[in-house]
């Protein structure tokens, strides 16, 4: 049985990796070995940052809620506690969106939270 050289398979594999490395700087988009290393590292970065994205958005929402709450004479922690005591079940994403898009509605929630804590 003759030996199969595998040129077609190797070429396809190399093309696939170089296509994934398109847009990378320098040899990372030109040379197969370097490109392969960078594609693998990029996959690791993507995996890690898909998890970090959730934390980052939560931080952003909390910062926005805190800023809006301070404009209404309270703090983030007091407001969230007040809403929990009042039985208002609203998540931070919606609360942050409300603070931006409907300041009057947010003010009403802030007043409700202040009343329920006292």
UniProtKB/Swiss-Prot annotation:
Alphabetized InterPro entries for the sequence: Ribosomal_bL20, RIBOSOMAL_L20_CS, Ribosomal_protein_bL20_C
UniProt keyword annotations, A-Z: Ribonucleoprotein, Ribosomal protein, RNA-binding, rRNA-binding
Sequence intervals crossing the membrane: none
GO CC annotation: ribonucleoprotein complex; ribosome
Cysteine-cysteine disulfides: none
Family indicated by similarity: Belongs to the bacterial ribosomal protein bL20 family.
The protein's name in its UniProt record: Large ribosomal subunit protein bL20
Species: Syntrophomonas wolfei subsp. wolfei (strain DSM 2245B / Goettingen)
């Amino acid at each position: 049985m003759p030996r199969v050289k595998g040129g077609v398979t190797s070429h396809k594999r190399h093309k696939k990796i170089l296509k994934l490395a398109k847009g990378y700087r320098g040899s990372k988009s030109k040379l197969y070995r370097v490109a392969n290393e960078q594609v693998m590292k990029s996959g690791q970065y993507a995996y890690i940052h898909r998890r970090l994205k959730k934390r980052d958005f939560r931080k952003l929402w909390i910062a926005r809620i805190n800023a809006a709450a301070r404009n209404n004479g309270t703090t983030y922690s007091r407001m969230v506690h007040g809403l929990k005591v009042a039985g208002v079940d609203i998540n931070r994403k919606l609360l942050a969106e409300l603070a931006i898009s409907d300041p009057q509605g947010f003010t009403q929630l802030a007043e409700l939270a202040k009343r329920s804590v006292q």
